């Protein structure tokens, strides 16, 4: 789904941070200032946003996985909702150090979480003592909170989408170490350096965050849908219809 400049304006994408907190590396994306607040150039944002969404669309069409990361209060619910809608992994609580760089260990925790969920589902947790069941439930809830969003990721993601680069420095460093491309919303108080696909704009407003996350989810779904259509089209080209004329029928 395409996003218009009007929608960006209504969501407050153009409102940056206070001018005294600005990062000079964001200068190319700044239009000016109003009441000591930097105003982001939405023409630049539109171009960069579309470039980022095209990348996500192609990635999804090629069955790629994009990890959505938004752990600050106003982003959590939005990120988990939109990632779930697109069938993509997400981190909406605290980023655990080593989530990518030490994924082998994280996989062990995922295995443990799945085992415990299976115990609840098949009722075997009820065979534990009251104390053991309580401890197991607490452990499961803790694991769900920290890694529930990535339990079906399988392996390292092909890309990562981040809301607020300053808030997620560890996640970004890990992705960079592993050569995982990063799509990120960068506000006027942060540096766009090291980000593969920069979306210059407000990273605090929940309406702006919803616009970005919905855009990523839509791009994923569009990419997958297009890939499916291509498969169907390729299949129909190979299909030859055989008509029965009934000439071989016996009386």
UniProtKB/Swiss-Prot annotation:
GO biological process, any: translation
SUPFAM superfamilies (UniProt xref): Ribosomal protein S2
Coiled-coil intervals: none
Classification via Pfam families: Ribosomal_S2
Keywords assigned: Ribonucleoprotein, Ribosomal protein
InterPro entries linked: Ribosomal_uS2, Ribosomal_uS2_bac/mit/plastid, Ribosomal_uS2_CS, Ribosomal_uS2_flav_dom_sf
Gene3D superfamilies hit by this protein: Glucose-6-phosphate isomerase like protein, domain 1 (3.40.50.10490), Helix hairpin bin (1.10.287.610)
GO cellular component: cytosolic small ribosomal subunit
GO molecular function annotations of the record: structural constituent of ribosome
HAMAP family reported in the protein's UniProt record: Ribosomal_uS2_B
Family assignment from sequence similarity: Belongs to the universal ribosomal protein uS2 family.
Name of the protein described by the UniProt record: Small ribosomal subunit protein uS2
Organism: Aromatoleum aromaticum (strain DSM 19018 / LMG 30748 / EbN1)
Taxonomic placement: Bacteria, Pseudomonadati, Pseudomonadota, Betaproteobacteria, Rhodocyclales
């Amino acid at each position: 789904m395409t996003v218009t400049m009007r929608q960006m304006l209504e969501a407050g994408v153009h409102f940056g941070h206070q001018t005294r907190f600005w990062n000079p590396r964001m200068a190319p994306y700044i239009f000016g200032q109003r009441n000591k607040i930097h105003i982001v150039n939405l023409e630049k944002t539109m171009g960069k946003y579309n470039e980022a969404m095209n990348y996500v669309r192609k990635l999804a069409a090629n069955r790629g996985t994009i990890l959505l990361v938004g752990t600050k209060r106003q982003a959590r619910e939005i990120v988990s909702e939109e990632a779930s809608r697109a069938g993509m992994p997400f981190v909406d609580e605290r980023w655990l150090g080593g989530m990518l760089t030490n994924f082998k260990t994280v996989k062990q925790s995922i295995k443990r979480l799945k085992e415990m969920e299976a115990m609840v589902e098949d009722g075997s947790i009820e065979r534990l003592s009251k104390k053991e069941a309580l401890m197991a439930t607490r452990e499961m809830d803790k694991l769900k909170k920290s890694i529930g969003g990535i339990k079906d990721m399988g392996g390292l993601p092909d890309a990562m989408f981040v809301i607020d680069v300053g808030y997620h420095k560890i996640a970004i460093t890990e992705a960079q170490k592993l050569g995982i491309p990063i799509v990120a919303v960068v506000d006027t108080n942060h540096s766009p350096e090291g980000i593969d696909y920069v979306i210059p704009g407000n990273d605090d407003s929940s309406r702006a965050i919803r616009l970005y996350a919905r855009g990523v989810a839509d791009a994923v779904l569009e990419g997958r849908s297009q890939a499916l259509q291509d498969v169907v089209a390729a299949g129909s080209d190979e299909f030859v219809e055989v008509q029965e004329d009934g000439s071989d029928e016996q009386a």
